[in-house]
Amino acid sequence: MSETQSWSSVLIALLAREDLSVADASWAMRQVMTGEATDAQIAAFLIALRAKGETVDEIVGFRDAVLDHAVGLPVNSMALDIVGTGGDRFGTVNISTTAAIVAAGAGVPVIKHGNRAASSSSGSSDVLAALGIDLTLPPERVAEVLRATGITFAFASAFHPGFANAAAVRSQLGVPTVFNILGPLCNPARPEASAVGVAPLDRVPLIVGVFQTRGATALVFRGDDGLDELSTTGHSHVWEVSRGLVTEHDIDPRDLGLPTAQIEDLLGKDAAHNAAVVRAVLAGQEGPVRDIVVLNAAAGLVSYELAADPSRVQEPILDRFRSHMAVAAEAIDSGAAVSKLEEWVAATR
């Protein structure tokens, strides 16, 4: 690509199937975030990029630009995000959202970052609204809620106003774009620990690579069934990222004492139904949904512990999961998780 950054040089490079540098990728995304790019330029950029195939350096540049233009969310302590990319097309209940509440009930500060539905029957924002949480809070109130309760929700559209500049184009294109990858990587609080479920297998190296390049701590995972969660229907693959190193693991839920579930056991409906499922699980209802929630809450706790003490990576991952599954289960059975939800609802009112 030429030394002078312009849409012409960016598009010529992409059409020639040349990868962009971090700096050039960041320049292009800044044009989108600031509203300087036209709809035609955005559409050409997104399609040419998708046709070529994104690289880790490009995603790093895009992420840096998005976060540079995000509304800040100051945090005074270590925090965790539990999120899924969506796109698995199963329409499950809100597993990562429920797991986030359980993790907060276990005492870990959680900053959930999300948007409208992608693969669940209702997205994290939809089900949280149905649970009674006010999602229209200004950014400073979002931070206050975290300090008061230990959990909060950063609505992507509120903290990334620049996303709106590409919204119409994305809707008209109707195909997945780089923005589908960026969501889980752009929590405005920049939490130290992440647990990220990824549905498309070809997206895993990109997301893992971004965490690795930036020296972040994360557990990235997908079910062999295609879920963007740690699955209980069969094996899951886990990529553990810490201090620039990646360790791969295979997780069989049976090794953790969990019975094998059927995907039908995990399917959701609309936001009201899914909110009722969340409340039932937090109230102690047993069954397949509780099992998968406990497993995914444990993933968040494992990541948070690893961020605090990177030497934990040397310990067997199944041992770490067993330990944190017990913590997650206790958060439910003691009533701490459902109490955390009620605290959260009250704090947003």
UniProtKB/Swiss-Prot annotation:
Gene3D superfamilies linked: Nucleoside phosphorylase/phosphoribosyltransferase catalytic domain, Transferase, Pyrimidine Nucleoside Phosphorylase, Chain C
EC number(s) given by UniProt: 2.4.2.18
* GO MF, one example: anthranilate phosphoribosyltransferase activity
Record InterPro entries: Anthranilate_Pribosyl_Tfrase, Glycosyl_Trfase_fam3, Glycosyl_Trfase_fam3_N_dom, Glycosyl_Trfase_fam3_N_dom_sf, Nuc_phospho_transferase
Give the residues the record marks as binding anthranilate 2.
Answer: R170
Which residues are involved in binding Mg(2+) 2?
D228, E229
Keyword set includes Transferase: yes
What is the annotated signal peptide range for this record? Answer: none
- List the catalytic activities from the record: N-(5-phospho-beta-D-ribosyl)anthranilate + diphosphate = 5-phospho-alpha-D-ribose 1-diphosphate + anthranilate
Q: Which cofactor does it need?
A: Mg(2+)
| Residues involved in anthranilate 1 binding | G84, N115
Per UniProt, Mg(2+) 1 binds at: S96, E229
Q: Which terms in the GO cellular component ontology are assigned?
A: cytosol
Q: What is this protein called?
A: Anthranilate phosphoribosyltransferase
Q: Which organism is it from?
A: Leifsonia xyli subsp. xyli (strain CTCB07)
Taxonomic lineage per UniProt? Bacteria, Bacillati, Actinomycetota, Actinomycetes, Micrococcales
